[in-house]
């Protein structure tokens, strides 16, 4: 995971005719994530997709036309090819760094990383970031994100204006959890993050649909439905105990059942559905602080 620059991008202002990017890529094997990991660079202006250009294996240069507009422009990378940007040059006009926006730490699993989205820019956190003017730090860990204490400590140590937590499906399989173990881990995770960010809104999203796991016990006897119930119960308990800046979003019905090509990860449309449901909640949490107003 550390070798894949999930969510790394370049945001800039200005109206150049184009930008040129000198780059180096390490691999053409996109692994289990597949084509959605990206084989191209692409520029967005605000939330409008602009020109894309294929990346080569090894060293190369790509030129991309940049559409005009007042919104920040964003260059997304071919993440799965493990790119390094060597240089970026504007043509036909100057560019400058985009203004700072509220910093959002988005912790989750491969769903947050963007698996089965059409491209890295199509992962639901990046759609939300563009639409809600947030500076997202994508902490999506494929095959992991089981509420590890080390991750909670890292989140607690980083500057943030908003934090989100969305994990659970990998606690049904891979490293199976019972409902009680999952609940204890989530509570510890939330306590550590809250200690580091006493006033920052935290949006907790319980596991989204996974048809094969909903009613099927894992090795410790827990169905995904049991883990989801435990997730929501822990968040509600923390709210009742005085965490007034903790938000709960039940995840079960956020994505339609036919939007999971591999049974686990939402497709491109499913990521749009997640962004549509979660974007306003994240914005509201940032602006209002407390779900109780």
Q: What kind of region is each of these model predictions?
A:
Residues 3, 13-16, 149-293:
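Alpha-helical cap/lid subdomain in secreted, periplasmic
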